[in-house]
């Protein structure tokens, strides 16, 4: 049986670094699973659009697609935007929407990879406070998930972990940095819980001016690519609801 095509659904951005990072991540996914067809579509700003990719797949005779939101939390885009776009797909396509990437232990591993690349070592954990800096959301579920991830991560040995948000929610990154200083952590690191560079990650970076360490975005980290494949495999389970025919 032919495997469903994996369609990675990215938000898109006017910042060219965003699309470049998405494409680099997709190339890593392809390298991890040769033979799996992986396509990329954007909701806005970049091409190809999700709708355009779906129409092209339909014209080729593809019938089975897993649409994977390139999102870390289940907020508005995953709940409303993406289902609305998929509902407009050609009726002959059978489309299953996969779960968003987070939360996942692999993403915590990717965050730590970025912190170590920025200069920390495992020996620094107990004396380092970390700001888990996300893009932000007005969705209560997404906010609660970020807070839960911070609590879970704290139990892996860090001095403390505080969530922060670049938009829509509080606290901001700079406030979380100050809180960790007040707790007495010997050093403070900021770990952006975002997938690609852009406007909000740049805001996180500015808010990290008072920190000792600023990690890079998650980007094409190997652990992120593995999460994509996990979500793809999970969506292939027949009991998941399909969008379309």
Where are these regions (language model features)?
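Active-site-proximal alpha-helix that buttresses catalytic centers in soluble enzyme cores
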Residues: 1-245
């Amino acid at each position: 049986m032919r495997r469903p095509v994996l369609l990675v659904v990215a938000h898109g951005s006017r910042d060219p670094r965003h699309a470049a990072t998405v494409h680099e991540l997709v190339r890593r996914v392809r390298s991890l699973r040769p033979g799996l067809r992986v396509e990329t579509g954007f909701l806005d700003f970049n091409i190809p659009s999700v709708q355009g990719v779906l129409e092209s797949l339909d014209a080729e005779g593809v019938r089975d697609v897993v649409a994977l939101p390139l999102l870390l939390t289940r907020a508005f885009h995953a709940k409303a935007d993406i289902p609305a776009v998929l509902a407009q797909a050609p009726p002959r396509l059978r489309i299953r929407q996969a779960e968003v990437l987070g939360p996942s232990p692999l993403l915590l591993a990717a965050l730590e990879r970025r912190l170590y690349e920025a200069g920390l070592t495992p020996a620094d954990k107990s004396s380092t406070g970390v700001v888990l800096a996300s893009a932000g959301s007005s969705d209560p579920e997404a906010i609660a998930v970020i807070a839960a991830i911070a609590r879970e991560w704290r139990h892996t040995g860090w001095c403390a972990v505080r969530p922060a948000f670049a938009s829509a929610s509080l606290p901001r990154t700079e406030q979380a940095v100050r809180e960790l200083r007040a707790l007495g952590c010997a050093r403070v690191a900021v770990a952006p819980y975002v997938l690609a560079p852009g406007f909000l990650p740049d805001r996180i970076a500015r808010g990290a001016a008072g920190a000792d360490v600023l990690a890079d975005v998650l980007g094409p980290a190997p652990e992120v690519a593995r999460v994509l494949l996990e979500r793809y495999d999970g969506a292939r389970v027949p009991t998941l609801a399909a969008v379309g025919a």
